[in-house]
Amino acid sequence: MKKINTAFFNNGASFVKGDVIDYVYARGRRQQVTAMTDLYPVVISTENFKEHADKLAGVEAIFTTWGMPVLETADLDRLPALRAVFYAAGSVKGFAKALLQRRVTVCSSWTANAVSVAEFCLGQVLLACKGYFQNTLDCRTPQRNRQDVAFHGRGVYGEKIAIIGAGQIGRRLIELLRPFRLKILVVDPYLSETEADDLHVQKVTLEEAFREAYVVSNHLPDLPTLQKVLDGKLFDSMRPGATFINTGRGAQVNESELIDVLRRRPDLMALLDVTDPEPTPAGSAFYELPNVQLSSHLAGAHGDEVVRMADTMIEEFRR
């Protein structure tokens, strides 16, 4: 059987040291693509596309990841056989428009990346229920590093956890939380009551979620209409000792109002994996507030986890 003609396309990614293709298609995944297809021997970038274009006319599928070049109409004219792009990463918004207009199938490993985010959030939710983050702050001084003095959370039994947005990540987190005796509140206007029953969750309003839950985890979709929707009034309504987790988008939070609330309410904790802008600029109060923990967009796939994204695209290709 004739193998399908394929090529790796990539411009590299600034946040990955070294070759991003080798990073994502690691542990023999690049070799798998080589073995199961007729792979073009050179990785194609914006810089070398014209040099190789005449030899790419028969390419039927592209494998890629972060750093996929944007192919314009003139570029696609030189790829007449192209039928599919397999993107071992998340959002395709940055490059997919012209491809979709040509009816090229664009596959993404968004679901695989969602697994990593949900697992990250699971760890934070469970630790937040225990009061771990506030407790570690207390334990920095000998006066408060005592079991009868340091902060203790409500624990992982019967507490309310709010998930804002029941998309791919939100639903995966719900699934991961299922073994624990927790009550899951969900804010999502598109979630039907039947779906909520099937997921064993309770639909609530945004105001109810912040007011009732001990941990609130944001998974809203990245839409302009949702910018700054999470405001100071919501944060100020949170229960004593509650925790806000953001692995969604920093722009969805009114950060100046969040800072004001955190200054007035040192009992609250904010775990921010995303801010607006990223990275968090020098001089931001987020660096100074003890009840803020910043991480560098760590929730998504990193390290060994990225191979799952390559596996997802290889499996999709084999279909």
What are these regions (language model features)?
Residues 166-167:
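Glycine-rich Rossmann-fold phosphate-binding loop(s) that bind the pyrophosphate
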Residues 276, 280-281, 289-310, 316:
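Adenosine-phosphate binding glycine-rich loop
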Residues 104, 109-160, 172-176:
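Phosphate-binding beta-alpha-beta segment of Rossmann-like dinucleotide-binding domains, i.e.
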Residues 88-89, 104-112, 207, 297:
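Short beta->alpha connector loops at strand-helix junctions that form conserved
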Residues 179-197:
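NAD(P)-binding Rossmann-fold cofactor-contacting core
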Residues 1-61:
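N-terminal glycine-/charge-rich "phosphate-binding" loop or analogous flexible N-terminal tail
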Residues 70-72, 191-285:
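Rossmann-like adenosine-cofactor binding region
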